[in-house]
């Protein structure tokens, strides 16, 4: 059994690379099954967010290169291009990495809580695909426990900040009074829900939620007294929007330069602040070339969240220690599991020998044998049979000069020095 964590994130890859390596929700089940089939991976899960795409894998023997090649082929990248941005963690490091990610220690915004929910979703999809078994399943459960402990026992989650909050903070810097601004939110997922909540709390004058399905947009809009529209209505809403924040799972851009240009003319070139949180991007990069548009992507939010890092660094150190302990505890339990099959086989063998000797004793008693003699013979016979195989192997190891194995046997049988049983001679 061997664990592997492999991928790219906001620290190693630009948004351009990340959007090319992203998985859509519709791709995940098939991708997982293909990954296991083509890379000799027994278990696998995929975490794909706007800031990272990671594969979590359990293999009999580690084959990171095969997995990296599969990822490059799947997304039609050259292996060299992917390798330039990829990181690979194996065994203990892979376990620790997963726990750090789930705890928000590897996030763009240190300690952000959304990543844990995204990790749980990745686990659920892998279960649906049938690519999670007992080992990776145990690792996910240990990861969730570690993240929960970090959240409970440290201040990593205090002063909650997320990419959504960072986007709203940036809007507040550009528009000093959000109470006079109108916002258009594109999408209706978790990130846009957080954006809507923060804008609502800041007293933004009007919020419009645009989504592929009106039902989903309406459910979100009702929570914050907003208006729901379809994606097709975006061009006419743009003309009234001071703030546009987008986060969908679309594979193609939703907003192009022409639509924004037209809206600016209607606004008499009153500026529009835009944040594209999506990967792949929802807003064409060329939109940023327009004079009256302030377009930011997730990569541009680094400076906004920098202040948040300062307040959480102390808590992060304590969280790192908890994660290290959690990773080590998991590896200890995993190593203990390696002995389970051996112990099971040894117990079955011992019980078979016991049953054989017990049947002999029962026959002797049925034939009128003396109970004391029968019991003594039972004990003697069982002892000899249980010691036979270890005795043969120990003599062989001794003849080969394997003193290390003899010392291990002494520890295994909990023998004190000089207390060697004559029955082993």
Curated annotation (Swiss-Prot):
CDD domains referenced in this protein's UniProt entry, alphabetically: NAD_bind_Glutamyl_tRNA_reduct
Parts of the chain that traverse the membrane: none
Binding site for substrate: 49-52, 107, 112-114, 118
Enzyme class: oxidoreductase
Catalytic residues of the enzyme: 50 (nucleophile)
Residues carrying the site annotation Important for activity: 97
Pfam (any one): GlutR_dimer
GO MF term list: glutamyl-tRNA reductase activity; NADP binding
Note: During catalysis, the active site Cys acts as a nucleophile attacking the alpha-carbonyl group of tRNA-bound glutamate with the formation of a thioester intermediate between enzyme and glutamate, and the concomitant release of tRNA(Glu). The thioester intermediate is finally reduced by direct hydride transfer from NADPH, to form the product GSA.
Domain comment (free text): Possesses an unusual extended V-shaped dimeric structure with each monomer consisting of three distinct domains arranged along a curved 'spinal' alpha-helix. The N-terminal catalytic domain specifically recognizes the glutamate moiety of the substrate. The second domain is the NADPH-binding domain, and the third C-terminal domain is responsible for dimerization.
Purpose: Catalyzes the NADPH-dependent reduction of glutamyl-tRNA(Glu) to glutamate 1-semialdehyde (GSA).
Protein name stated in the entry: Glutamyl-tRNA reductase
Native species: Pseudomonas putida (strain W619)
């Amino acid at each position: 059994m061997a664990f592997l964590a492999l991928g790219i994130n906001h620290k190693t890859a630009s948004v351009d690379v990340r959007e090319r390596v992203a998985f859509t929700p519709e791709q995940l089940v098939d991708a997982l099954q293909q990954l296991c089939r083509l890379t000799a991976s027994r278990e696998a899960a995929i975490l794909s967010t706007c800031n990272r795409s990671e594969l979590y894998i359990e293999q009999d023997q580690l084959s990171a290169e095969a997995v990296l090649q599969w990822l490059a082929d799947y997304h039609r990248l050259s292996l060299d291009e992917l390798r330039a941005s990829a990181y690979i963690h194996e065994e203990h490091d892979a376990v620790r990495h997963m726990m750090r990610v789930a705890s928000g220690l590897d996030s763009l915004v240190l300690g952000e809580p959304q990543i844990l929910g995204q990790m749980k979703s990745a686990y659920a999809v892998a279960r649906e695909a049938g690519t999670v078994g007992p080992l990776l399943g145990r690792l996910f459960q240990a990861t969730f426990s570690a993240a929960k402990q970090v959240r409970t026992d440290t201040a990593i989650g205090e002063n909650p900040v997320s990419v959504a909050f960072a986007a709203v903070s940036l809007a507040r810097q550009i528009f000093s009074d959000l109470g006079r601004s109108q916002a258009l939110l594109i999408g209706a997922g978790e990130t846009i829900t957080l954006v809507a909540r923060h804008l609502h709390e800041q007293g933004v004058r009007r919020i419009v939620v645009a989504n592929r399905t009106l039902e989903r947009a309406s459910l979100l809009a009702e929570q914050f007294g907003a208006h729901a529209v379809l994606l097709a209505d975006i061009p006419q809403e743009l003309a009234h929007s001071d703030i546009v924040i987008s986060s969908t799972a679309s594979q193609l851009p939703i907003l192009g330069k022409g639509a924004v240009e037209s809206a600016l003319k209607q606004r008499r070139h009153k500026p529009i602040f835009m944040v594209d949180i999506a990967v792949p991007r929802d807003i064409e990069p060329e939109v940023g070339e327009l004079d009256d548009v302030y377009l930011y992507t997730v990569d541009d939010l680094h400076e906004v969240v920098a202040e948040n890092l300062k307040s959480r660094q102390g808590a992060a150190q304590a969280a790192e220690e908890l994660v290290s302990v959690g990773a080590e505890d998991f590896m200890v339990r995993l190593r203990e599991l390696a002995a389970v099959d051996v112990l099971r086989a040894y117990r079955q063998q011992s019980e078979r020998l016991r049953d054989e000797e017990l049947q002999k004793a029962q026959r002797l008693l049925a034939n009128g044998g003396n109970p004391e003699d029968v019991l003594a013979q039972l004990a003697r016979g069982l002892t000899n049979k249980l010691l036979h195989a270890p005795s043969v192997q120990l003599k062989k190891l001794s003849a080969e000069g394997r003193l290390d194995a003899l010392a291990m046997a002494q520890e295994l049988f909990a023998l004190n020095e000089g207390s060697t049983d004559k029955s082993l001679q």
